[in-house]
UniProtKB/Swiss-Prot annotation:
This is UPF0301 protein lpg0586. It holds the Pfam family DUF179. Belongs to the UPF0301 (AlgH) family. GO terms for cellular component: cytosol. It comes from Legionella pneumophila subsp. pneumophila (strain Philadelphia 1 / ATCC 33152 / DSM 7513).
Length: 187
């Protein structure tokens, strides 16, 4: 069995026992995991307002009306005013972090303008806020059965409907999430 030294570029799946409203039934893409802590983005929690709100705030008039309807996602409780665009292709954006072949995270407004003008990446998720864990906090939560760890799957990030991602991520591990007990315990 291989030992994983970093959980970066993995997915966290909230166990049914996790009742924190910020993380209940969430799937988190881990952008960073090291000895200082972890940072991730929740990828299955659409907010009640669309991207058109961001376009209005930035005074952008999108070329294609359907861009207005792109959902914004709740990325986590830390800095909820801060936006993150998860996308496949690189590009010349001002502030991008390449994480792996299919995942780049950009935080600069130029990518939002490109999306509005139909010049941005095809596959995108736009989140507000992020999740963070202090040193060893995530490891303790995993050991206490708060999270399952799933290898990255492109379809979970870009194709599976938001409301199905939690169950789908579990199925990639052979687990039916709705059949797990919300009671924590150890055998």
């Amino acid at each position: 069995m291989a030992i994983i030294s970093s959980l970066a570029n993995h997915l966290l799946i909230a166990m049914p026992s996790l009742k924190d409203p910020n993380f209940e039934r969430s799937v988190v893409y881990l952008c960073e995991h090291n000895e200082q802590g972890s940072v991730g983005l929740i990828i299955n929690r659409p907010l009640q307002f669309p991207l058109s709100i961001v376009f209005e705030q930035l005074q952008i008039e999108p070329i294609r009306v359907e861009k207005n309807g792109l959902p914004l996602l709740f990325g986590g409780p830390v800095q909820p005013e801060r936006g993150f665009v998860i996308h496949k292709q690189m590009g010349g954006w001002r502030s991008s972090l390449f994480l792996q072949d299919e995942v780049t995270v950009t935080t600069s407004n130029d990518i939002i303008r490109a999306i509005a003008y139909d010049e941005g990446p095809k596959d995108v998720l736009i989140t507000l806020g992020y999740a963070a864990w202090t040193e060893q906090q995530l490891e303790r939560e995993i050991m206490s059965n708060t999270w399952l760890v799933c290898p990255y799957k492109s379809e979970i990030l870009y194709e599976v409907p938001f409301e199905e991602r939690w169950e789908y991520a579990g199925l990639t591990l052979g687990i039916k999430m709705n059949q797990l007990s919300s009671d924590a315990g150890h055998a």
